[in-house]
From Swiss-Prot:
Its EC number is 1.15.1.1. Its cofactor is Mn(2+). Destroys superoxide anion radicals which are normally produced within the cells and which are toxic to biological systems. The lineage of its organism: Eukaryota, Metazoa, Ecdysozoa, Arthropoda, Hexapoda. One of its GO terms (molecular function) is superoxide dismutase activity. This is Superoxide dismutase [Mn], mitochondrial. Transmembrane segments: none annotated.
């Protein structure tokens, strides 16, 4: 219910302003190859993410109707489906921006924070990689910012749980360890996929997210 209560107003507003749409990628489907192949990106973005968008729009219409009828039981019944598809849409929207075919480096402020909290940048990469690879079933590895404690944190979430809604952390960097993110190319070699993904991390985007999180 807490997730539902926090997001019901967003549902109503979304219905008023229009439907959710699939975000356009900031690069071509083949731009991240050979780390992420063109075929995988086409399916992952154009099929899987599109399905989350379609399902989210459908469930929002149903929830808006139930809310207008004051049918609380129906709203609660739909909330799990809503949370799953909203999380899938939100997580992937961040994930695409977190990737880039162009090499980049973290900002001085972000790199300093990482080194202070994880002893070194390389240790941070090892820790987040291990956490992501260790996800049981489907889920995500995340670098987030804890505004209350004013520090970075890494953690894993299951399925499509949206990081900020379930943990309070501001999402900075996502590692998608659902099988559909890599299986067509790397089969069951999730570890190789996670390790290779550091080469296409968009540190400009991640650093911008960190700067915004720390200044507000």
């Amino acid at each position: 219910m807490s997730f539902l209560n926090r997001n019901l107003s967003r549902t109503i507003k979304a219905a008023v302003r229009g439907k959710h749409t699939l975000p356009k990628l900031p690069y071509d489907y083949g731009a991240l190859a050979p780390i992420i192949s063109k075929d995988i990106l086409e399916v992952h973005h154009g099929k899987h993410h599109q399905t989350y968008v379609n399902n989210l729009n459908a469930v929002e219409e149903q929830m808006t109707e139930a809310h207008s009828k004051k049918d609380v039981n129906k709203v609660v019944e739909l909330s799990k489906n809503y949370a799953f598809n909203w999380g899938g849409h939100l997580n992937h929207s961040i994930y695409w921006q977190n990737l880039s075919p162009t090499k980049s480096e973290p900002s001085a402020d972000l790199k300093k924070a990482i080194e202070e909290q994880f002893s070194s940048f390389e240790q941070f990469k090892k820790d987040l990689s291990a956490l992501s690879i260790g996800v049981q079933g489907s889920g995500w590895g995340w670098l987030g910012y804890n505004k209350k404690x004013k520090k970075l944190q890494i953690l894993a979430v299951s399925n499509q749980e949206p990081l900020q809604a379930v943990t309070g952390l501001v999402p900075l960097f996502a590692i998608d360890v659902w099988e559909h993110a890599y299986y067509l190319q790397x089969k069951n070699x999730x570890a190789k996929y996670v390790e290779a993904x550091w080469d296409i991390a968009n540190w400009k985007b991640i650093s911008d997210r960190y700067a915004e999180a720390t200044c507000n």
